[in-house]
A protein has these predicted regions:
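Strand-loop microenvironment adjacent to phosphate/nucleotide-handling motifs in alpha/beta enzyme folds
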Residues: 1-171
Length: 171
């Protein structure tokens, strides 16, 4: 069964391009699309365990990607979010903030339509989906075996639990 992906982007072209790329694979399927952060947040809240990963734009109307990430973090909603950023430089402030707010990783959005068709862009999307969804599955298996589900989060970064001096997968 294909892993379910939610795409949140205000650009109809990017929604279509990303959906087409993902749907080329038998492993993933775009099952929902949102045209802004508010619509995306509603989808996530109403179906919190529906999506294996979310591909999110930063610059959007109503609720931008950073605000959406902050809301997910504040409300303790566990999701694997990959940011597809319009920011040209990888070290840009918005991208760093997205990672701080819980994004799994990011891909720089192509500057023109021809670049969206490049093998490099497709590979970046698939590589991130593979790493993100496999990390999430591995962490869930660990939490099931150890009974520490509340300490395990989907991003796979390390954090020390308050009641232990040993590192544990969390974010």
């Amino acid at each position: 069964m294909a892993k379910k992906i939610l795409v949140i982007d205000d650009s109809a072209l990017m929604r279509r391009v990303i959906s087409d790329i993902i749907n080329e694979s038998d492993e993933y399927e775009v099952v929902a699309i949102a045209k802004d952060g508010l619509e995306g947040l509603d989808m996530i809240v109403s179906h919190p365990y529906e999506y294996s990963a979310i591909i999110l734009d930063i610059n959007m109307p109503k609720l931008n990607g950073l605000e959406l990430l902050k809301r997910l973090q504040k409300d303790h909603i566990e999701q694997t979010v990959i940011v597809v950023s319009t920011v040209a430089k990888e070290g840009a402030k918005e991208t760093i903030q997205a990672l701080e707010y819980g994004a799994f990783d990011f891909v720089t959005k192509p500057e023109n339509y021809l670049e969206t068709k490049s093998i490099d862009f497709k590979n970046k999307i698939f590589n991130m989906l593979n790493v993100a969804t496999n990390s999430r599955s591995s962490l869930r298996r660990v939490s099931m075996r150890t009974g520490s589900a509340s300490s395990v989060r989907s991003t796979g970064t390390f954090r020390k639990p308050e009641d232990s001096s040993k590192p544990f997968f969390a974010s």
